[in-house]
Amino acid sequence: MVSGIQPEASQGLRPGGLPEGIRAAIYAVAFAVALSTWFIEIRAPLWLDETVSMFLIKGGWAGIMSRQVWPDAPAYSCLLWLWTKVMGTGEFMLRISSVLPMLAAVYLLYRAARELFDQDVAVIAAIVFCLHPIIIFAAIDVRPYAFAALVINATILTLVLLRHNHSNWLAALFGFLAASIVEFQLLFAAILPALAVCFIASKIGDRKTLWRQLGIALVVFTLAFLPAIPRLQYMMHTSGTHVFSEAPRLLQLVSTITVRGLVIILVVFVLVAAARRSLDLRNHEGQWTVLLCISLALVPLLILYGLSVGTSIHVFVPRYRLVAVPGIALCWGLVVSWMNSRTLRLLFCAALVVVAACVCFTAASFHRHMYSWKDALAFAEKNASVDNAPVLICSDIPEADHMRMPVGAAIEETGILPPLSYYKLTVPVAPLPRTLNEETIRAGSMFLQQQAERRFLAMAFVESYGTLDWLAKAAGASHTVHELGVFDGVKVLEFVPR
């Protein structure tokens, strides 16, 4: 991907002083360092949403099909299930199942950028993509996002190739890939308006080809989108039950575009290029390229931000913002292309990678994938298995606040306690909702009556600490309460009969 980088004299690019072999080697090392940031937490335990992925595949093909109403991606569940059949269910191998499609996504973004810019700029765009914190997270996350990134970048590449192509097959592929984006994550439909605008703009001078290819793409898109309609309807009817974050701040929007402040390095090099008269703002790439880069970055990001600010549906969380990262990387590439000095481009790439790598390998936030129930459940299993003490667990999924608590075998079937799908407990388990509500009090009071003369444990993550406080007060007359520890935010209490 980085070998044989050649100068582009036709665009007035100033040649650099380094031999091509050394230049290519520096880019190769920069790319390798950028990729290495993905592996900092490759052995991290599974967090809540990843255990949801394991719950969805636990019943095999039949189980996946029966759980399609869950707000997830059946296509991804099938791929993950096949992967576990071949490679097992170890944490490391599960994370590799996301690394591989993300690597392919990087290559496809490079290919798309290469169609738009010089080769060294395409490499830099791919490196920016790799270094984005959202990509670093998604690259090892056992969720559909790596595959979604792969499909998004494949769609972008197809769109770029369609500019000067009259193929019906390529138009059909574009429609299929666009629908596949939504299949892997419903919220990623936010990128569809940008894709549509750029497709129409690329064919505006040839209306005959536009209508033919647009018609084919729409027909294929509609057919490929049909399987996602039941999930979309379910999400729309239950949208309020899936909210788990606060309304976003403008700083989060800016941080996503600026790659957490790394844009300062880009600004510095742009100023240096301007001072050295190596900054060429003439539109070598064409208006369509500018439209493509800006649309892919801003349209999906602003749709998610506007939806989160203007309604109670707060979906501006980092993993959903992934839909805009390819466009952001291309925007960075667009700005770098204005530097007509190959040496400045190389120095910018080196500086960007060095600073980003230092941040990633030293900042505490990059040394923790997400909180996990693993240690808390292991402790509870060891403690409770001595006398088969039951464990009362506050569910960590927001949907639990809108359910009647299941009992017996239904606990496992409903998936209300996803961590137990991967980190097992052999003792009796009872669930409670995520927040302290009427169902919490009803189910909790019933549990306390049943265990009035028996030792038991209670567990909850931060959002459910209020429920633990209520339990301690409600059981105060019959039990003595001890805090046994807090494991990655999961508090464990012991209730001993008086």
Model-inferred region functions:
Residues 1-19:
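Short, Lys/Arg-rich, polar N-terminal cytosolic tail immediately upstream
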Residues 19-498:
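Terminal, non-globular segments
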